[in-house]
Amino acid sequence: INLDITQQQDYAAPARAIYWGARQIMMEIGRLDPGDIIDYQINKKGFTYALLTGGTGNDESRFIPPMRGQFYDIVPFWTTEPTVRKVYKVNIPMEKEMQFQFYQGECTSSMRYEDGRKAYTFVSTDIMPTRREPNMVDLFDAAPKLMMSSTPRWQDKSLWFNKVNEDYGSFSAIPEAQKKVDELIQGKKTEMEKIAVLTHWVADNIRYSGISMGKGEGYTLHNLKMNYTDRCGVCKDIAGTLIAFLRMAGFEAYPAMTMAGSRVESIPADHFNHCVAVVKLSSGTYMPLDPTWVPFCRELWSSAEQQQNYLPGVPEGSDLCLTPVSAPENHYVRIKANNRLDAKGTLTGQFTITAEGQSDSNIRRIFTTGWQSQWQAALESQLLAVSPKARLIS
């Protein structure tokens, strides 16, 4: 049965916290009986991730990638449904070079010359759905995937990320923000005191809500004027606000891309889902900062994301970096209890909990994920997890 693709429907994609006007194309295929196979083909042009608005079918400029002249793709070869055959094919100009690697599985691959161009083809057959396990790593770290990129080195991606935001003026100072920075760092004597107060202010005052800036959205950090006026943005805009604040305080700071939840391979494909900041300390080393995760957290970088790859967009260019390991003693939990067991076997007492780092953040989360009126119920639920007979006295 050949489906009439003219019957497809174009809908606004569901959105939560990020409102960039994404669309989704949906089509009804009808009832499927055992043994039926869906055979479909998707054609892509230009670059992997795009927020295309306006333009006509002949407007080729819409397909120019942000990193002009470069192509990358990240292709999951795992499936959620039994799949007879999956084919991925990319056609590039003869003069372009492409590096690729297939991870965590096998496929049939080839490169052929077709009509004066290079055609790379990757085929996998008889694919069964990947079985998930409790608390397993991300599927990108465990299941078959293809990574490819025409960009030679990570340094090239780093230089591009630096230039595209500097050229746009993402971190240009504005008087009203400079006044706030001067107010925040007044009386702060050390560089870490200044970095901490600026990071926490941005984290607590720029809420996570993404509004599209139009052209350039998705890879360009909103400028400080927009962020400080709207007091909202996604991770890149929150990081951009912090970078501008740090620069107004006299620091050297830049944006960085990272991948929360899975590793980034050596192939310089844009496998990132999060934006953070780096600040150069007096020692000359760069320190990562994550204002998106700092609210209700005593840390300046979430230690839940240790040994995580990130790429700073610095003027000298950077290779892929790795976030540092945080020692266990930075995340202690200490419970001091004073209890009394009576003759009837009832244990009564009080205890004090002190914590640091991510342990502190986890305890705070009991109180920060709900209303203040729910605090007592939240504490009672913690006690009931220990014993169904426990009661919160005060």
Where are these regions (language model features)?
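Second-shell loop/turn segments in exported
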Residues: 23-28, 181-189, 224-232, 364-368
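Short, solvent-exposed loop/turn segments at the edges of secondary structure
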Residues: 22, 33, 83, 115-117, ...
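Hydrophobic/aromatic-rich core segments of domains that either
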Residues: 236-326
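Short, conserved phosphate-binding/catalytic loop or strand-edge motifs used
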Residues: 178-179, 214-225, 259-261
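Active-site-proximal cofactor/substrate-binding loop regions of enzyme domains
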Residues: 196-197, 202-203, 222-232, 238-248
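Generic beta-strand/beta-sheet core signal
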Residues: 30, 125, 203, 238, ...
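Lumenal/extracellular ectodomains and adaptor appendage modules
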Residues: 1-82, 121, 153, 327-394
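Secretory-pathway-linked proteins and extracytosolic
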Residues: 41-57, 65-216, 343-367
